[in-house]
């Protein structure tokens, strides 16, 4: 492995989350969207807002589900953290969703140290989900991140790895 492999893996995992979300947001209000989604607006008329919202929610969720439960590895995948960041970065130039998740990961890694990683990840996603419901901009962001959080927390809970006791230490306490 090494650092180069790690960086390339991180870029790839984030990219597979970023690309579908970013492209969906760029294309959904354009003339290209109807043919790509096979919607004939002459027959069906305007796409209802709730259909677009549900579609965007699944576009947010799909890369994370695919990373955590890949078919080709018998549903045994990764934790979905980098892919979640990629999905949230897909909302660019609105970086609020990704910054909230990053804030809590940094907070629980450096200031309020929660160990092991299992508990830190669950605390991060639960706190970020609370902030999303208060200050999230769109229903699709809120619903998408809620579902991602549920899937990531379930994945963490279902992992068969040995769990040490949760330890919480403050930065200034050793």
Regions found by a protein language model. Give the residues of each.
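Interhelical loop and helix-boundary elements at the membrane-water interface
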Residues: 1-18, 33-36, 47, 67-83, ...
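Generic alpha-helix detector with strongest preference for long hydrophobic helices that associate
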Residues: 5, 39-46, 50-56, 66, ...
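Interfacial segments of multi-pass membrane proteins
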Residues: 1-2, 81-114, 126-136
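Residue-level signal for alpha-helical transmembrane segments in multi-pass membrane proteins
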Residues: 22-23, 110, 130-134, 151-158
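Helix-coil boundary and interhelical linker segments in multi-pass alpha-helical membrane proteins
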Residues: 22-58, 89-98, 133-144
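Alpha-helical transmembrane segments in multi-pass membrane proteins
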Residues: 12, 16, 20, 24, ...
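Canonical bilayer-spanning transmembrane alpha-helix
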Residues: 116-144, 150
């Amino acid at each position: 492995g090494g650092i180069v492999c790690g960086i390339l893996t991180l870029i790839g995992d984030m990219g597979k989350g970023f690309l579908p979300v970013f492209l969906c947001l760029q294309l959904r209000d354009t003339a290209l969207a109807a043919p790509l989604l096979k919607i004939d607006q002459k027959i069906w008329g305007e796409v209802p807002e709730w259909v677009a919202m549900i579609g965007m929610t699944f576009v947010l969720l799909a890369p994370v589900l695919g990373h955590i439960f890949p078919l080709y590895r018998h549903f045994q995948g990764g934790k979905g953290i980098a892919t979640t960041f990629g999905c949230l970065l897909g909302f660019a130039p609105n970086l609020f969703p990704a910054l909230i998740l990053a804030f809590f990961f940094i907070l629980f890694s450096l200031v309020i140290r929660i160990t092991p990683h299992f508990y830190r990840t669950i605390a991060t996603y639960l706190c970020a989900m609370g902030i999303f419901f208060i200050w999230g901009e769109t229903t699709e962001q809120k619903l998408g991140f809620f579902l991602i959080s549920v899937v990531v927390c379930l994945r963490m809970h279902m992992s068969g790895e040995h769990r040490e006791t949760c330890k919480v230490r403050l930065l200034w306490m050793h």
